[in-house]
Amino acid sequence: MLKDQNLDIERKQDHIEINLTKNVESTLKSGFESIHFIHNALPEINYDSVNTTTTFLGKSLQAPILISSMTGGTTRARDINYRLAQVAQKAGIAMGLGSMRVLLTEPDTIKTFAVRHIAPDIPLLANIGAVQLNYGVTPKECQYLVDAIKADALILHLNVLQELTQPEGNRNWEKLLPKIREVVNYLSIPVIVKEVGYGLSKKVAESLIDAGVKVLDIAGSGGTSWSQVEAYRATNSLQNRIASSFINWGIPTLDSLKMVREVSKDIPIITSGGLKSGIDGAKAIRIGANIFGLAGQFLKAADTSESLLSEEIQLIIEQLKITMLCTGSRTLKDLAKAEIRL
């Protein structure tokens, strides 16, 4: 057991370091580069009246942005999460925590995840890998994770390719959907299911919605490739070659968004995976997202300073607002109907 605990911590440290220092981008594009807004040269809107507010999980957001799940469990991760929470609270945006499985075996790691005292007002998302339900994690333990950080929802992330390219990865993905349904029925708060960078298909979205999942985070291809991250962690050439061969795997984010929105016009969708700017976020809103998530650039900024992170988030918000004005969109509902060309 101690060996497994140490491995969890070591893996989290590796993931931070590799994401900060190596090129782990997918060779696929997100797809949003193919979408272009029709410029409105006479928008007849005052910039100060552009309204980016929305609601998510019953709470108000000043902008439709999620700091996507990244890290936790280590001292460095604690510092990163504290900065993320501080800036998210000030900006009025949502925040996801990294995988909290380690908290089930190492209670002292709670201090690396517990940020509610820093961010009392924002939607805060707990997180654990869905496959852990096949390895002994119970609905009761999922509720414990939620309660431990006073979360507004629980993310169950789907990371099958990452697990299969990880030396110590979990390989049993059989009969997982019924267990997801059990967690949905047990928890006192909504369950979000999130991919980690390879996209959700129409068929998977249908199954998850039928199981009672309340929000989907499509996390398509075009951003961080976790198989590439695991290629850097490989302990031998065979593992490296296996992981590296999946650098261009997955459903591009735009395609996944369209697929999932076809399944349901009502399910809240978080769009993440390869979004680089508020302009990309605006495109996601236009195609059917409710909010959009970013991780990589926020991680790099948060590892440096709170001020740099604050500037990065302000950049995204200003890009979004300018895009809205230049498309004649006073609100996010207007943006969802803005003229585009493909």
Swiss-Prot record:
Involved in the biosynthesis of isoprenoids. Catalyzes the 1,3-allylic rearrangement of the homoallylic substrate isopentenyl (IPP) to its allylic isomer, dimethylallyl diphosphate (DMAPP). It comes from Rickettsia africae (strain ESF-5). The keyword Iron does not apply. It is an enzyme of class 5 (isomerase). GO terms for cellular component: cytoplasm. This is Isopentenyl-diphosphate delta-isomerase. It catalyses: isopentenyl diphosphate = dimethylallyl diphosphate. InterPro entries: Aldolase_TIM, FMN-dep_DH, IPdP_isomerase. Its cofactor is FMN; NADPH; Mg(2+). Homooctamer. Dimer of tetramers. FMN binds at residues 68-71, 99, 127, 194, 224, 274-276, 295-296. Its EC number is 5.3.3.2. Keywords: Cytoplasm, Flavoprotein, FMN, Isomerase, Isoprene biosynthesis, Magnesium, Metal-binding, NADP. GO terms for biological process: isoprenoid biosynthetic process. It is found in: Cytoplasm. Belongs to the IPP isomerase type 2 family. Substrate binds at residues 11-12, 99-101, 162. Signal peptide: none annotated. GO terms for molecular function: FMN binding; isopentenyl-diphosphate delta-isomerase activity; magnesium ion binding; NADPH binding; oxidoreductase activity. The lineage of its organism: Bacteria, Pseudomonadati, Pseudomonadota, Alphaproteobacteria, Rickettsiales. Mg(2+) binds at residue 163.
